[in-house]
Amino acid sequence: MRVVFMGTPEFAVPSLSEILANGHDVVRVYTQPPRKSGRGQKLTKSPVHQFADIMGIPVETPEKFRRSSAIDGLEAIDADVACVVAYGQILTSRALATPKYGCLNLHGSLLPRWRGAAPVQRAIMAGDTQTGVQIMQMAKGLDTGDILLSETVDIKDTDTAETLASRLSHVGAEMWARTLGAVEREALRPTPQTGEATYAHKIEKSEARIDWTRPAKELDCHIRGLSPFPGAWCEIGGARVKIHLAKPADGKGDAGTVINASGIIACANGCLLYTSPSPRDRQKSRMPSSA
């Protein structure tokens, strides 16, 4: 089939790779424009853009896909289907209807739970024990389309947003072969979403500051859900310390008190041992203080 692929972050690369490996003709890739990043603030292509360049696939980077010129270009491609994975742009009704079989989206949750921008992070932060990956037929609403294929994935007690996203991206990539095969055979059986919807709102930087008055288990989930970006943090001895991993530990004290130099901090009920500060942060945290 003639496939258009739309995606931007590393999460989307395995899907593009798998679609190519299954012999589909990816005629165009759409991704976000290059952005400034790193200490030198150099313009950097997205991971999907870089992979498409390696594979020799033409790439389009419209600032806003809702503009008529971008949709005109999509119509001219005459694609059978568009595969969308974390593209980061809103597709209009006209765009959704352009490919012969419409636009299919891979989403990192079991819908309708965690519709929106940050389903992986929110699932961990909420203490969910399961999530999943689904491919849906895109509709006008936010992640409201009918489900075409679904896989459940367990969330481990040690999962961070990074490790869970990596696992979901590879599970999702393997789902494209079955989905596109069903598209070719015109054998899709869409299933409407059921149940109460919850929304995975974009992660705000203000959420990264640790509130030690919360229970230890909640904070464990919160910290892992924000790892590695933006990274949870607190102040220890007047210094800002990022905490990427933590686990419940024994100890007593007022919330926010550093119990000892090994990194045990008191919470509302119980304590947390933070286990992965950077060497620089570890040096800062050795003096017992209030977090």
Label the predicted regions:
Residues 1-39:
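N-terminal Rossmann-like dinucleotide-binding module
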Residues 36-49, 53:
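N-terminal beta-loop-helix "entrance" segment that forms/cooperates
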Residues 201-214:
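Acyl-group handling in specialized metabolite and lipid biosynthesis
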Residues 213-276, 280-282:
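An anion-binding loop in the catalytic cleft
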